[in-house]
């Protein structure tokens, strides 16, 4: 399944100066002004944060927001990469509601950010009266180290490992659980787990798959 993201407002082009403190990025606009944008990505953004990279920003609609821009896209090679990790949930929700993902079709209700497990929230919970609930965890994928191959994670993710354990617990309780990786770039046709970056996560995923 592939999706085209439509932003509510035209994006603004700039050039990356630096990304720092995980959630901040200084970007030079075409006017020459240097602004600080919100970086909605807690990962390492390996290969996507080099100074001088072309960046695309969305303007904040809330005039009271401290940071007036959000960093949405960065150019990597000949293509653009979506680095906003808050977008995949909306993309997948729209795809499910539109019947585009056969494996997740046929449920009566879709809810987002539902509490479950040990102080966690599931990205999407699908429910119907006549079938077990389905817990869907979504991960944003941006890493490409090998031509055509997207990988996850791009840094050690203890939180991701915790989520896998909680999904396994849901399966043990009789529910269905799905781990969905959304690749936010167009230059990859394959996907793999970056076991060398986080072997603990890779092992946890194997255990979760074995658990159902």
Residue ranges of model-derived segments:
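Conserved hydrophobic positions within beta-strands
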Residues: 14-16
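Short aromatic-glycine-enriched beta-strand elements
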Residues: 21-27
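Short alpha-helix capping/helix-loop boundary micro-motifs
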Residues: 35-45
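Short nucleic-acid-contacting surface segments enriched for D/E, G, S/T with interspersed K/R
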Residues: 43-56
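OB-fold/S1-family single-stranded nucleic acid-binding modules
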Residues: 62-79
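Active-site metal-binding core of divalent-cation-utilizing nuclease and nuclease-like domains
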Residues: 76-86, 97, 102-142, 162
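Nucleic-acid nuclease catalytic cores
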Residues: 145-158, 165-197
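N-terminal intrinsically disordered, cationic/polar leader segments
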Residues: 197-212
């Amino acid at each position: 399944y592939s999706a085209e993201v439509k932003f509510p407002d035209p994006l603004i082009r700039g050039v990356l100066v630096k990304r720092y403190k995980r959630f901040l990025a200084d970007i030079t606009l075409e006017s020459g002004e240097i602004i600080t944008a919100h970086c909605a990505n807690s990962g390492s953004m390996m290969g996507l944060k080099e100074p001088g990279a072309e960046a695309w920003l969305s303007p904040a609609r809330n005039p009271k927001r401290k940071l007036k821009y959000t960093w949405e896209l960065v150019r990597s090679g000949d293509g653009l990469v979506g680095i906003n990790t808050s977008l995949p949930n909306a993309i997948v929700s729209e795809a499910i509601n539109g019947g585009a993902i056969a494996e997740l079709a046929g449920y009566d209700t879709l809810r987002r950010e539902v509490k479950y497990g040990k102080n966690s929230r599931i990205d999407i919970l699908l429910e119907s009266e006549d079938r077990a609930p389905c817990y869907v965890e979504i991960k944003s994928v941006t890493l490409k180290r090998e031509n055509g191959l997207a990988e996850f994670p791009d840094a050690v993710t203890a939180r991701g490992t915790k989520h896998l354990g909680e999904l396994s617990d849901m399966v043990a309780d009789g529910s269905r659980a799905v781990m969905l990786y959304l690749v936010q770039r167009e230059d990859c046709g394959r996907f793999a787990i970056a076991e060398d970056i986080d072997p603990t996560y890779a092992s946890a995923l194997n255990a979760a798959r074995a658990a159902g």
